[in-house]
């Protein structure tokens, strides 16, 4: 004679349930259950049941539990030889920390304190920036029950979503960053520039600027001075006309157009010159010339000592 004891589940409460709370499973022949398996293979063995009888199991929901099906097993998952019967219970909702709506941090700057209000924020283990960096945070709950987490926006924060993460690893968005960048930047002077000139760049949130990259140069230079409204930087000799880039620690850059001085030819002093002789050129900004290229490809390097006149040797 053989017989079976039909294991059955009648109710599972509470649902939704918060990690750390006690889940009560009621049914028949639950005394045969050796393991309660939460979604994605997260088992709790009968030794860890809070209560266990024919009609009821009480089990603490693991902090790592996620929303999904719960499975009851009449043998342990550690028993590789056992032929397990599995009873699936669909639709357990595991509570996550939540906010009513993600904050808009568009106007925020590195160093600003960010306060996030929400529910079940005590579950938060990690606050992560858009670039993947984890930041320290403080959790608080007021006497009226208001929950908050507070953190400081780091220097290298980038645009994107800030998320909070509980033990389950599920990421929940709490804020979106559109970093407060320097905008409407004006360069003074913006034209007629030469190496060694001091350029004043005026705008908003200029204290965010860490370096300046000039057109024609790979290596960035540091500002000579900066404040919330302006940055002062010395024009390198090798810089050319184009867009200089104001760089921030977050990796973002803002372009500003500049124009350098150009040498201007006006006249030759001597109309006829013999090979190997000297020729004198008159013009403007001639001290900017470093090399003269003749028809045919011959080159002569020069060291001007005047802005209006340049004497060079004709090639032989």
Segments and roles (model prediction):
Residues 1-316:
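Ser/Thr/Pro-rich low-complexity tracts
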């Amino acid at each position: 004679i053989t017989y079976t004891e039909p294991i059955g589940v009648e109710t599972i409460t509470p649902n939704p349930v918060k990690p750390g709370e006690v889940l009560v499973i009621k049914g028949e022949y639950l005394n045969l259950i050796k393991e309660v398996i939460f979604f994605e293979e997260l088992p709790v063995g009968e030794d860890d049941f809070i209560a266990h009888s024919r009609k009821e199991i009480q089990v603490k929901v693991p902090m790592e539990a996620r929303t999904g099906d719960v499975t009851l097993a009449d043998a342990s998952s550690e028993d590789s030889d056992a032929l397990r019967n599995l009873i699936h219970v669909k639709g357990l909702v595991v509570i996550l920390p939540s906010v009513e709506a993600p904050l808009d941090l568009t106007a925020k700057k590195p160093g600003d304190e960010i306060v996030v209000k929400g529910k079940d924020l005590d579950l938060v283990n990690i606050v992560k920036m858009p670039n993947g960096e984890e930041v320290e945070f403080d959790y608080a709950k007021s006497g009226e029950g208001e929950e908050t987490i507070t953190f400081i926006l780091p220097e290298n924060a980038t645009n994107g979503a800030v998320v909070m993460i509980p033990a389950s690893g599920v990421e929940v968005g709490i804020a979106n960053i559109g970093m407060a960048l320097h905008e409407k930047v004006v360069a003074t002077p913006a034209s007629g520039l030469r190496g060694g000139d001091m350029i004043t760049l005026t705008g908003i949130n200029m204290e965010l600027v860490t370096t300046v990259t000039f057109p024609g140069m790979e290596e960035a230079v540091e500002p000579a001075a900066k404040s919330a409204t302006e940055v002062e930087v010395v024009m390198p000799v090798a810089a050319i006309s184009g867009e200089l880039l104001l760089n921030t620690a977050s990796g973002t850059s803002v372009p500003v157009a500049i124009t350098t001085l150009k040498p201007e030819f006006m006249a030759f002093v001597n109309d006829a010159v013999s090979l190997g002789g000297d020729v004198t050129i008159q013009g403007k900004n001639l001290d900017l010339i470093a090399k003269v290229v003749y028809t045919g490809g011959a080159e002569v390097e020069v060291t001007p000592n005047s802005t209006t006149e340049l004497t060079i040797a004709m090639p032989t």
